[in-house]
A protein has these predicted regions:
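N-terminal interaction/assembly modules
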Residues: 1-127, 132-134, 138-171
Length: 171
């Protein structure tokens, strides 16, 4: 019975459901990348090949995975600037990866609404780490979002402008 409640009822919910599954897999792939030291290409072929039949999902996941890796230094610098009394190296790996995914979406995926990126990162942290991790990820990403918005570094368009505060700033 529980499964039926989690299944999507509309095309929009189906896309959201797929995207959540993709983000979960990307988190797992980034974890494997950190732990194994294998190349991104190997990780993609080994852990993401089952998504190749759905081209849109595969491209989103591949792009998210590679964007985190390609921009990891900048992403980590942004995260480090918002974690007071912590060093990024001391964060739980899952929390760090969830934050990286959230920051990557905020910075490099202009079509994704900021609230979606933040919420999805929170859900990843809660599912794969702890309930407290969700609150931590929420606080850090909220601070990052506010700074990006205030400094004009939040480049959102299309669906990414669903956030009313962004729409007002652009008008």
């Amino acid at each position: 019975m529980r499964i039926e409640k989690e299944l999507p009822n509309s095309e929009y919910e189906e896309v959201s459901f797929k995207r959540r599954l993709i983000r979960e897999r990307v988190l797992q792939m980034l974890y494997a990348y950190e732990i194994s030291g294998n190349s991104p290409e190997f990780i993609l072929s080994d852990l993401f090949s089952d998504f190749q039949s759905d081209k849109e999902s595969y491209e989103f996941g591949k792009s998210l995975f590679l964007s985190v890796i390609e921009n990891i230094d900048e992403i980590d610098r942004i995260i480090a600037s918002k974690i007071k009394n912590w060093e990024i190296e001391r964060l739980a790996l899952i929390d760090k990866i969830a934050l990286r995914i959230g920051v990557c979406e905020l910075k490099y995926f202009p079509e994704i609404p900021p609230k979606v990126s933040i919420n999805e990162a929170i859900e990843l942290a809660k599912k794969f780490s702890t309930e407290r991790s969700g609150k931590f990820v929420n606080g850090v990403l909220d601070a990052i979002y506010n700074e990006l918005r205030e400094t004009g570094q939040l480049n959102k368009y299309g669906r990414g402008l669903i956030d009313k505060s962004l729409r007002k700033e652009r008008d």
